[in-house]
From Swiss-Prot:
Documented EC number(s): 7.4.2.6
Annotated SMART domains: AAA
Protein's name according to its UniProt entry: Oligopeptide transport ATP-binding protein OppF
Native source species: Salmonella typhimurium (strain LT2 / SGSC1412 / ATCC 700720)
Cellular location(s): Cell inner membrane
Coiled-coil annotated spans: none
PANTHER family linked: D,D-DIPEPTIDE TRANSPORT ATP-BINDING PROTEIN DDPF-RELATED, TRANSPORT ATP-BINDING PROTEIN
Chief location category: membrane
GO molecular function, one term: ATP binding
Top-level taxonomy: Bacteria, Pseudomonadati, Pseudomonadota, Gammaproteobacteria, Enterobacterales
Catalytic activity line of the entry: a [peptide](out) + ATP + H2O = a [peptide](in) + ADP + phosphate + H(+); L-alanyl-gamma-D-glutamyl-meso-2,6-diaminopimelate(out) + ATP + H2O = L-alanyl-gamma-D-glutamyl-meso-2,6-diaminopimelate(in) + ADP + phosphate + H(+)
Function: Part of the ABC transporter complex OppABCDF involved in the uptake of oligopeptides, including the cell wall murein tripeptide L-alanyl-gamma-D-glutamyl-meso-diaminopimelate. Probably responsible for energy coupling to the transport system. Plays an important nutritional role and is involved in the recycling of cell wall peptides.
Cited Pfam families: ABC_tran, oligo_HPY
Length: 334
């Protein structure tokens, strides 16, 4: 399966992507230069046609900022983001407009992402009216109803408002809005974290079904490692704005190489109570460093159980193969 993915067309190519924010503290004198918060600091990867890339990491590691930088909701500081060979970071507004019909986003809070003053029919139809203004009202209505059926919503609910729906239904509305233009890539920014567990499974299964039917590529961001394993072809592990491990889901989950990934995977619950009782969880010592003042060299070295003197001097880079790559001076990716 993964060998087949590698042979497919590259949709998205990201090289050394950086997103930095200038931070000015209240007690800082005006002549002092602002401090820099490094939210994303040098992520490189490729996304292939029809692939699902899972992105995991603890809160504050830069997952959502990374996703928003791809679609232009956050301005990138440096690096390259190429969509079908076109550099997105240097695009003008009219060129971006064309690309955005191919790249859509599903947000974390389903209700907050919907306009409370608009009916769900108007919400789902808004991208159509923006990109296809010549469509008749009946054509727009027909397409909206067809998309509602596709995501599991009854068309006779078209004139209702977001507050009349449950969280899972609101997320389906958000999915319908993202898919109405038939994009090639959907960025899912923790789309199930605000939902009940039973509803999470329904939304994940719906995304997989729509991916098969429409040939979508997905970037799926989540905290729940079990959900990411279920839906992903490859998994990217982020820590403090850096990519520390990237590989197929079976390699990352069953043969993690980076110490941070090993700690994450050791915390995944096991259904068997006997195995769960005897499982050893690898605890990380210390606090997550500040992205304003990250450690020198390897950013994980202050919490790493195998760090050496060289880890403070040299910053590791992601090395390895398509199946498995790791960013660690102490680990051989081969």
């Amino acid at each position: 399966m993964n060998a087949v993915i590698e042979q497919r067309k590259v949709l998205l190519e990201i090289a050394d992507l950086k997103v930095h924010f200038d931070i000015k503290e209240g007690k800082q004198w005006f002549w002092q230069p602002p401090k820099t918060l490094k939210a994303v600091d040098g992520v490189t990867l490729r996304l292939y046609e029809g692939e699902t890339l899972g992105v995991v990491g603890e809160s504050g590691c830069g997952k959502s900022t990374f996703a928003r930088a791809i679609i232009g909701l956050v301005k990138a500081t440096d690096g390259k983001v190429a969509w079908l060979g076109k550099d997105l970071l240097g695009m003008k507004a009219d060129e971006w407009r064309e690309v955005r019909s191919d790249i859509q986003m599903i947000f974390q809070d389903p209700l907050a992402s919907l306009n409370p003053r608009m009916t769900i029919g108007e919400i789902i139809a808004e991208p159509l009216r923006t990109y296809h203004p010549k469509l008749s009202r009946q054509d727009v209505r027909d397409r909206v109803k067809a998309m509602m059926l596709k995501v599991g919503l009854l068309p006779n609910l078209i004139n209702r408002y977001p507050h009349e729906f449950s969280g899972g239904q609101c997320q389906r509305i958000g999915i319908a809005r993202a898919l109405i233009l038939e994009p090639k890539l959907i960025i899912c920014d923790e789309p199930v974290s605000a939902l009940d567990v039973s509803i999470q499974a329904q939304v994940v299964n719906l995304l997989q079904q729509l991916q098969r039917e429409m040939g979508l590529s997905l970037i799926f961001i989540a905290h729940d490692l079990a959900v990411v394993k279920h839906i992903s072809d490859r998994v990217l592990v982020m820590y403090l704005g850096h990519a520390v491990e990237l590989g197929t889901y079976d390699e990352v989950y069953h043969n993690p190489l980076h110490p941070y990934t090993k700690a994450l995977m050791s915390a995944v619950p096991i259904p068997d109570p006997d195995l769960e009782r005897n499982k050893k969880i690898q605890l990380l010592e210390g606090e997550l460093p500040s992205p304003i003042n990250p450690p020198s060299g390897c950013v994980f070295r202050t919490r790493c159980p195998i760090a050496g003197p060289e880890c403070a001097q040299t910053r590791p880079v992601l090395e390895g193969s398509f199946r498995h790559a790791v960013s660690c001076l102490k680990v051989d990716p081969l």
